[in-house]
Design a protein with these regions (language model features):
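N-terminal subdomain of nucleotide-sugar transferases
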Residues: 1-56
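Short hydrophobic "strand-cap" motifs at the C-terminus of beta-strands
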Residues: 6-8, 154, 204-206, 231-232
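Donor nucleotide-sugar binding/catalytic pocket of nucleotide-sugar-dependent glycosyltransferases
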Residues: 39, 55, 138-187, 193, ...
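Glycosyltransferase donor-sugar binding loop
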Residues: 43, 205, 226-239
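A short, charged, and often flexible helix/loop element on the N-terminal side
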Residues: 52-80, 92, 132
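An aromatic- and histidine-rich active-site surface loop
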Residues: 90-117, 122
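Nucleotide-sugar donor phosphate/pyrophosphate-binding loop at the beta->alpha transition
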Residues: 112-114, 121-143, 153
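Conserved donor-binding/catalytic core segment of Leloir-type glycosyltransferases
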Residues: 194-225, 229
Length: 239
């Protein structure tokens, strides 16, 4: 099978969208499928892409979050790229701008599309100082996912959010834990003794950004015998 993956964000910027695309590439390669990644050009890529071809497009940084890049590619350009690759299916990773044009290209070529909803763009608009755009963004998300052949969402809550936008071709695609990276065998009693001897550690590992609402973890901070730990980077990380 030949799979074209269009990603709104990609390496070298690492986030949930990038991470899931890399996992998909790894699994598709293991099954012997051919892949093409279409994504913003944002810098040198040194990560193993598991044999995937890449088509990196000119992009511009998002003013309020420069690590995120926006591609303004015409559907005709994407249609030409896809026609040359001849995909059996188009995978749209967190589609919004590039994904909308990619969806139009897939439709033009009569290729089925699978859209993966994993970014709450409405919350982004509200958290990054554009609350007046939230309703417009929500309508766009609804149109996009209603147009896709199938939409995958990671949770019951996100499925319900899409249903409220009139999206009906839905399946849940849950997220697991990378047990090669995270497991009890990696526990370090020496490290725990240094940072929180005898205390219960409540930890957060991920991107530090307004939409993650990490401040909610302040609630257990006052509990006796509890220490908070944060590991990650992003726009909310103190300079």
């Amino acid at each position: 099978m030949r799979v074209a993956l269009l990603a709104e964000s990609f390496l070298p910027h690492m986030n949930g969208v990038t991470g899931s695309v890399l996992q998909v590439l790894r699994h598709l390669a293991a099954e012997g499928h051919e892949t093409l990644v279409i994504a913003p050009r944002a810098g040198e890529i040194t990560t193993d892409l598991h044999g995937a071809r890449t088509e990196l497009l000119r992009s511009a940084p998002l003013p309020s979050y420069p690590e995120v890049r926006v591609v303004f590619a015409r559907a005709a350009r994407l249609t030409a790229i896809l026609r040359e690759f001849r995909p059996d299916v188009v995978h749209l990773a967190s589609p919004f701008v590039l994904g909308w044009q990619g969806l139009a290209a897939a439709d033009a070529l009569r290729v089925p599309s699978v859209a993966v909803y994993q970014t709450d763009v409405v919350a982004y608009a509200e958290k990054y100082g554009m609350p007046q755009a939230a309703a417009l963004v929500g309508r766009h998300i609804g149109r996009l996912h209603r147009r896709a052949t199938l939409t995958l969402a990671p949770s019951t809550a996100s499925l319900q959010q899409l249903e409220r936008l009139g999206v009906d071709r839905l399946r849940r695609w849950g997220r697991g834990v990378d047990v090669e990276r995270f497991g009890p065998e990696r526990r370090s009693d020496g490290w725990r003794a240094q940072v929180a001897r005898g205390a219960t550690i409540v930890g957060y590992v991920g991107r530090l950004a307004p939409e993650k609402q990490v401040e909610g973890l302040a609630a257990p901070a006052g509990l006796p015998g509890t220490r908070l730990g944060f590991l990650g980077g992003g726009p909310s990380r103190p300079a």
